Amino acid sequence: MIKLIVGLGNPGAEYTATRHNAGFWLIDQLAREAGTTLRDERRFHGFYAKARLYGEEVHLLEPMTYMNRSGQSVVALAHFFKILPDQILVAHDELDLPPGTVKLKLGGGSGGHNGLKDISAHLSTQQYWRLRIGIGHPRDLIPDSARAGAKPDVANFVLKPPRKEEQDLIDASIERALAVMPVVVKGELERAMMQLHRNP
């Protein structure tokens, strides 16, 4: 059963619309669905709400520590409520998936994502659930003729807003993720994966 859903992003208005904040976008939607409001909770170093989602009690969290210190926030809440790593779902932007794609998985490496890297370090395990929201990779924007030897600027890419057509695809993928949340919060993760991965 999933007891904590974390969305990753950076605090501050200048980051709100950037690709790196896709995890925050999902949490904002979940809070709206639950009819609750995230509030600044200093002991958890983030914005937090206890929500009733689809008949289950779930903690929602947006760390306000900046991305590379997300683990500080996650572990503070997990320890306080005695939540185990495999009861945690972390929603984050995923460079290795195109916009419009969303995938669910348990464990694995960080794939260069500093938020995941810090969470794994603080939890002392990689065995927590991830909801990977595809944002695409900057290399995909380089013409084939210019790709040889090109070094895409990933840091700049994730800290910029998506183009409108990309945003529409990302929004649609978040809607698909929301559609499987009733199954996710009940702990039927394999079923949720089958439903989610049937679609691109």
From Swiss-Prot:
Site (Stabilizes the basic form of H active site to accept a proton) location in chain = 93
Assembly mode: Monomer.
Enumerate the Gene3D superfamilies for this protein: Peptidyl-tRNA hydrolase
Please report the name of this protein according to its UniProt entry: Peptidyl-tRNA hydrolase
Annotated gene: pth
A cellular component term from Gene Ontology for this protein is: cytoplasm
NCBIfam families, A to Z: pth
What family does this chain come from, according to its entry?
Answer: Belongs to the PTH family.
Q: What is its EC number?
A: 3.1.1.29
Q: What class of enzyme is it?
A: hydrolase
Reactions that this protein is recorded to catalyse? an N-acyl-L-alpha-aminoacyl-tRNA + H2O = an N-acyl-L-amino acid + a tRNA + H(+)
